[in-house]
A protein has these predicted regions:
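Conserved N-terminal/central alpha/beta ligand/cofactor-binding core
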Residues: 40-156
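Beta1/beta-strand and adjacent pyrophosphate-binding region of the FAD-binding site
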Residues: 2-15, 33-35
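Gly/Ala-rich phosphate-binding loop of Rossmann-like dinucleotide-binding domains
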Residues: 20, 24-25
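Short coil/turn connectors at secondary-structure junctions
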Residues: 4-5, 28-30, 67-68
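Short beta-strand "acidic-cap" motif of Rossmann-like dinucleotide-binding folds
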Residues: 29-36, 41
Length: 156
């Protein structure tokens, strides 16, 4: 195979997919080879419904291996942040490295990409603010810190 690539990305989970996307957006690569173990999405199926148990597909599980892993067949949640709160409760300790505003910008940027590719515009966790406030106060009395942030539902 004499094909030449500007970049080769191994592993097509969210990090690999976003890395390839960014290479293209930044015009750093046009011809990218994406490699992941497992079959193509359209060739992946799980026999568990037919046989009633996991048959341990070989060499790789048809559900967890391949482009997007199990995410190709399930839903996900993109945790955002609360505009009314100075703290960000997602992204680990990223804000300690790049600051709160830059972290918020990255979260917004990621959310915009998902929306661009068809994510549901509706946000979960933004309704019932008064009820959440009451539950949060009750939780605090029990030593529990209830964190309420918007969630974007992705997939099925």
């Amino acid at each position: 195979m004499s094909e030449k690539y500007d970049a080769i990305v191994i592993g097509m989970g969210p990090s690999g997919i976003f890395f390839a996307y960014e290479l293209i957006q930044l015009k750093k690569a046009k011809n990218i080879l994406l490699i992941d173990q497992g079959k193509r999405v359209e060739n992946r199926n799980c026999p568990i419904e037919k046989v009633g148990k996991c048959v341990k597909c070989q060499p790789y599980c048809n559900i967890t291996s391949g482009f997007s892993g199990a995410g190709a067949f399930s839903d996900g949640k993109l945790s955002l942040y609360n505009d009314e709160d100075d703290d960000i409760y997602v992204g680990g300790i990223l804000q300690e490295y790049i600051g709160v505003e830059n972290t918020k910008r990255l979260i917004d940027y990621t959310d915009d990409i998902y929306l661009k590719f068809g994510a549901d515009k509706k946000l979960e966790g933004v309704n019932f603010k008064d009820e959440v406030k009451v539950i949060k106060e009750k939780s605090k009395k029990q030593g529990i810190n209830l964190i309420n942030i918007p969630i974007r539902h992705l997939g099925t």
